[in-house]
Amino acid sequence: MSVLRSGSPHRPARSLATVAGILLALVSLLLGLPGTAGAAAMKPAPEPTHPGQDWAGSQIARHEGTAAGGAPPAPSLASVEGVDVSSHNGSVAWSTLWNSGVRFAYVKATESTSYTNPYFAQQYNGSYNAGMIRGAYHFATPNTSSGAAQAKYFVDHGGGWSKDGKTLPGALDMEYNPYGATCYGLSAAGLVNWMKDWFATYKARTGRDAVLYTSTSWWKQCTGNSAAFGAVNPLWIPRYGSSVGELPAGWGFHTVWQYTSTGPTVGDHNRFNGSMDRLRALANG
């Protein structure tokens, strides 16, 4: 009869393998538990608490001030006057704006996946009824949900597009975070990927490449001056001074210039960089 001796060479090998397996299982379990560093990094921020106070440029003057050099030059024949509005403007006097020469408008539709502008119908339909070409924009909060989720919410709540000659492609407002960390707690690569997700989803839903609203200063700080969008997405740039100034990487020209936040009737005034025919072409796609 054979005797199992304590010095058998096989038992330690089996014990080591068992211990290694247990350790591997424990490590895998720990990595998958909530509250770990990886999970915490993916936890969404709370939904916006004052979305009615967030509009295109609401953070620009606060962070960048007004550029030296005074008022912008007089409009040229190759430009079209426009405005942008949100709920903070309330019911807008569109006939007054039309009579002053305003011919296009952007209207805030949504923020994150929880807010819709309560004045959207009056502003979006009112500008259209006055004769203007108009479009909608989304105020991005990249730390609350994915780019795809926010693009879908935008399209479902007023941000769609139709080839009627009066509807501009939707716009994505990327600017300083009104709720905390300037770059929303994301890395440059993380923000770029979030925007790619948003733009791809918007195009899949509407067939159009959306406009990007951003300032050169924020863009440099938060995306590392990425050149990923300049060849496709028209640039809407805020700068309150006598010229557009330096553009973000990737763009050789701007499409819309938000040149003041203190203009008549609604505050934010813009100039389209081209003739009325070119503005219609942008609307028609």
Task: List each language-model region with its residue ranges.
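Substrate-binding cleft of extracellular glycoside hydrolase catalytic domains
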Residues: P75-R205
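Functionally critical loop-and-helix segments that line ligand-binding/catalytic clefts
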Residues: M42-N89, S95, A228-G285
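Flexible, glycine-rich phosphate/dinucleotide-binding loops
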Residues: S114, N143, W219, V244, ...
